[in-house]
Amino acid sequence: MVSESVQARIDKLLNEAREAVAESNWAVVLNRAQNVLRIETENEDARALLAAAERAFEMPS
């Protein structure tokens, strides 16, 4: 279990990542998801966002 302040930081990063998804800003999604996973390695939301960003980078434009 993480502290309240750490959880607030995780929530902020995840919200920023979700906003970036809406803008197709995959570099930000990737960055924010990786930051969450550095704090909480098993965070499922961050893992899903990271996977989405990685798929987006693999797609031809």
Q: What does each model-identified segment do?
A:
Residues 3-10, 52-61:
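Alpha-helical linker/edge segments of TPR/alpha-solenoid repeat scaffolds
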Residues 8-35:
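Alpha-helical segment of the N-proximal tetratricopeptide repeat
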